[in-house]
UniProtKB/Swiss-Prot annotation:
Tissue specificity statement from the Swiss-Prot or TrEMBL entry: Testis specific.
Name assigned to this protein: Disintegrin and metalloproteinase domain-containing protein 32
Its membrane topology: Single-pass type I membrane protein
PANTHER family, sorted: ADAM A DISINTEGRIN AND METALLOPROTEASE DOMAIN, DISINTEGRIN AND METALLOPROTEINASE DOMAIN-CONTAINING PROTEIN 32
Subcellular location(s) of the protein: Membrane
GO terms, molecular function: metalloendopeptidase activity
């Protein structure tokens, strides 16, 4: 007979209507990676790594060691319209790490490095979450403090499967136990199922859901480390379209249903225990499991309910407690059981606490008793969890192990190679064997250009530093600087002009299509018009505001059909425009050549960023604010650091340096001109104001001289008169509903003119008229001239 234990949610705690778990103290940080591969005998690259992570303006060094808890044959089972699909090749199994924080021996860190850093940093009594900042240009991450304000979150209750009384107690004390053997490594293989509601709650994205499950398993592993138990995630099943069993009822009822389904459908999938994760807003129980039944196939299962307003850290504790129950570990008596940390894992109040958690001595004795008396043979087989690279082979063209170079076979290397094909080390006298700054086996001198500008207005040419054969990182000017006569902005080192791009793809005369064409093609959300694919390989609709930020649509200027090898062409006749786009039939892993690039103009004052049409003023303002630190003698680059004008040097371009120049002088002039448009306008305005004043002043001086001469002559010729030529200029503009007419006339006469002069121009007078008339469907322009 077995007893069913349930994890009961406290009414005044986790399931209260107010949020209980909160993420606070949001920080944007840039972790700095430190290479520390100290294990030279290991065949696994980057087995040990370290990061410097700023928290609250203080730097912490995190030391990590690679952990393997994903099986090499790890599979994801996903459902789409009733049919099941499997995925495995896209899952990375060697980017999960655990470790601690330097100077804090009781700390615990669990991180994934697959795509940025994602995981939890736990100090003694406080925890921080970290994850990559989406759409960030640099290695920026969001760091936040995990905070829980609830009390009495959860307690365990038990239900007997039969109505017979049971002797055992839910709590155990630290009494003397019989001698048990030392612990030895055990491997618990899990098959986890995520129901439809939790799949949707986590975003309906298979990759996001997978990462969350992996993070939960990683946190559980960090807690089971002291027992030498590795929780191996052997497979993951996502009920993405519908639940395969009813999820209505209490946790114990759901467990019975899940066991029946498990026995029918999971026989061929290797696992020691199967778990069903279900989302419920406010469940009465948080889980159900049969204690002490780990290696009994009929009962090796559990159901864990994910309630509203809970963190992954807290849910990982719930899963850990349930796994511990299956391994015969009882719930602690807080009065009698102690652990090295402030809160023990099997403590009734552990879910409401933050920071590092460990098993108590009571849990250790209970676990030792279980493996000694009951046995855990099913956990003794070690699954393959790391794909070890083969031993280095010199001459295969791949850099492996301790090889300095590997150019391939003797024929492939050739006599001019800098690498010895026999030993895979550099030849005598050689300083390098490849790289943009390596020529004739020698490192090029400092200042030699190794990477020219990709765009003359938005990129920076990189030079060799004289010590490395590599060219160094590709640095561009900061996003937001104006380019192409202030029509566009620089973004990622380029000035994206959709008209020019259309012309390069579809030929001369092609232009970016009007919005109506984008609306016609992009609204279909198919292979011709979309904003990419989601994790389920479905096309994403752009949304009305973002239609131009999906795939490029152009006008087609000729009647000759456009031919694209290995591509399908679609035309759309919208109003008076012929629109065109192409699907290149490329693999999903290859970027779409017609995807609209970041920084492309999508509306007046707006540009595309990550397939969203956003205001460009924010990007421009960011560039302006950054460049203010350059003291007016430089602009910012993509690292938010100053590149200085000739004669000034970093970091703030304040100090003069004779002969120092980051940019060529002619380039820096144009850059500064674009970066300081306000300065240019100020000079122009000053010039326009000063010019009339100068003219008037000159005229007054000349007039005074002329008057002196006139009075002098008047004494001699009192009856003489002086006449001057006069001129009249008129500009007239007249508009109506049908069109507009603009006329400019100029008259010059040999005789003096006055305000009362009413004479009209004759044959010697000239007039020019320009007439423009436009209608809804056509336009006519006429220019006439008469003499």
């Amino acid at each position: 007979m077995f007893r069913l234990w349930l994890l009961l949610a406290g009414l005044c705690g986790l399931l209260a209507s107010r949020p209980g778990f909160q993420n606070s103290l949001l920080q944007i940080v840039i972790p700095e990676k430190i290479q520390t591969n100290t294990n030279d005998s290991s065949e696994i690259e980057y087995e040990q790594i370290s990061y410097i992570i700023p928290i609250d303006e203080k730097l912490y060094t995190v030391h990590l060691k690679q952990r393997y808890f994903l099986a090499d044959n790890f599979m994801i089972y996903l459902y789409n319209q009733g049919s099941m699909n499997t995925y495995s090749s896209d899952i990375q199994t060697q980017c999960y790490y655990q470790g601690n924080i330097e100077g804090y021996p009781d700390s615990m860190v669990t991180l994934s490095t697959c795509s940025g850093l994602r995981g939890i940093l736990q100090f003694e009594n406080v925890s921080y979450g970290i994850e990559p900042l989406e759409s960030a240009v640099e290695f920026q991450h969001v760091l936040y403090k995990l905070k829980n304000e609830d009390n009495d979150i959860a307690i365990f209750i038990d239900r007997s499967l039969k109505e017979q009384p049971m002797d055992d107690n839910i709590f155990i004390s630290e009494k003397s136990e019989p001698a048990v053997p030392d612990l030895f490594p055990l491997y618990l293989e899990m098959h986890i199922v995520v129901d439809k509601t939790l799949y949707d709650y986590w975003g309906s994205d298979s990759m996001i859901v997978t990462n969350k499950v992996i993070e939960i398993v990683g946190l559980a592993n960090s807690m089971f480390t002291q027992f030498k138990v590795t929780i191996v995630l052997s497979s993951l099943e996502l009920w993405s379209d519908e639940n395969k069993i009813s999820t209505v009822g209490e946790a114990d009822e759901l467990l019975q249903k899940f066991l029946e389904w498990k026995q029918s459908y999971l026989n061929l999938r290797p696992h020691d225990i199967a778990y069903l994760l279900i989302y419920m807003d406010y469940p009465r129980y948080l889980g159900a499991v049969f204690p002490g039944t780990m290696c009994i196939t009929r009962y090796s299962a559990g159901v864990a309910l994910y309630p509203k307003e809970i963190t992954l850290e807290a849910f990982a504790v719930i899963v850990t407690q349930m796994l511990a129950l299956s391994l015969g570990i009882s719930y602690d008596d807080p009065k009698k059981c102690q652990c090295s940390e402030s809160t023990c894992i099997m403590n009734p109040e552990v879910v409401q606490s933050n920071g590092v958690k460990t098993f108590s001595s009571c849990s250790l004795r209970s676990f030792q008793n279980f493996i000694s008396n009951v046995g855990v043979k099913c956990l003794q087989n070690k699954p393959q969890m790391q794909k070890k690279s083969p031993k280095p082979v010199c001459g295969n063209g791949r850099l492996e192990g301790n090889e300095i170079c590997d150019c391939g076979t003797e024929a492939q290397c050739g006599p001019a190679s800098c690498c010895d094909f026999r030993t895979c080390v550099l030849k005598d006298g050689a300083k390098c064997y490849k790289g943009l700054c390596c020529k004739d086996c020698q490192i090029l001198q400092s200042g030699v250009e190794c990477r020219p500008k990709a765009h003359p207005e938005c990129d920076i040419a990189e030079n060799c530093n004289g010590t490395s054969p590599e060219c160094g990182p590709d640095i561009t000017l900061i996003n937001g600087l104006s380019c192409k006569n202030n029509k566009f902005i620089c973004y990622d080192g380029d000035c994206h002009d959709l008209d020019a791009r259309c012309e390069s793809v579809f030929g001369k005369g092609s232009r970016n299509a009007p919005f109506a064409c984008y609306e016609e093609i992009q609204s279909q959300s198919d292979r011709f018009g979309n904003c990419g694919r989601d994790r389920n390989n479905k096309y994403v609709f752009c949304g009305w505001r973002n239609l131009i930020c999906g795939r490029l649509v152009c006008t087609y200027p000729t009647r000759k059909p456009f031919h694209q090898e290995n591509g399908d062409v679609i035309y759309a006749f919208v109003r008076d425009s012929v629109c065109i786009t192409v699907d290149y039939k490329l693999p999903r892993t290859v970027p779409d050549p017609l995807a609209v690039k970041n920084g492309s103009q999508c509306d007046i004052g707006r540009v595309c960023v990550n397939r969203e049409c956003v205001e460009s003023r924010i990007i421009k303002a960011s560039a302006h604010v950054c460049s203010q630190q350059c003291s007016g003698h430089g602009v910012c680059d993509s690292r938010n650091k100053c590149h200085c004008s000739p004669g000034y040097k970093p970091p703030n371009c304040q100090i003069r340096s004779k002969g120092f120049s980051i940019f060529p002088e002619e380039d820096m002039g144009s850059i500064m001109e674009r970066a300081s448009g306000k300065t240019e306008n100020t000079w122009l305005l000053g010039f326009l104001i000063a010019l009339p004043i100068l003219i008037v002043t000159t005229a007054i001086v000349l007039a005074r001289k002329q008057l002196k001469k006139w009075f002098a002559k008047e004494e001699e010729f009192p009856s003489s008169e002086s006449k001057s030529e006069g001129s009249t200029q008129t500009y007239a503009s007249q508009s109506s509903s049908e069109g507009s007419t603009q006329t400019y006339a100029s008259q010059t006469r040999s005789e003096s003119s006055s305000q009362a002069d009413t004479s009209k121009s004759k044959s010697e007078d000239s007039a020019e008229a320009y007439t423009s008339r436009s209608k809804s469907q056509d336009s006519t322009q006429t220019q006439s001239s008469s003499n």
